[in-house]
Amino acid sequence: INHILNSDKHLNKNVSIYGWVRTFRANRFIALNDGSCLNNIQCVVDFEKTEQEILKKITTGAALNIKGKVVESQGSQQSIEIMVDKCEILGGSNPEVYPIQPKKHSFEFLRENAHLRTRTNTFSAVMRIRSNLSFAIHEYFKKNGFYYVHTPIITASDAEGAGEQFRVSTLDMKNPPLNNYGQ
């Protein structure tokens, strides 16, 4: 969605996009977001040509694959929109229980729904920033001759009693160094 919104090369061309429904207004306008940018892309559905069963399943939080043509928008809120040729429901969402609505939620509320919080503007922005920072750091070190090494992870967890904890130390535990007092 980010590439489509920020480039004219898709104008008057057919595209296929995936995302989650932020809003669905008047059985016609879908605001779709995939987390790649803050803005939603408006998808215009011809409700006379679209099956009623599909229209009923387009609810906030539903995952869709939209195929259609990118055109200049008739409205003033966005510069382009997608005229939907085909809409496929990849994952439904029950509007009665889907907790993320098009409003601002508290961080406490989002902690309680951690599996969905990346669908909010705040957390998707944090994810994009972290991704760009990590990439920049890795790129810097790569350009300066460093290697990225996956070190072993040593943890204190014992899954199902199948192992025993062991101590990792640089000291000789049978003959530890003593201080001036013999301790």
Stretches found by the model and what they are:
Residues I1-Q183:
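Class II aminoacyl-tRNA synthetase catalytic cores and aaRS-like
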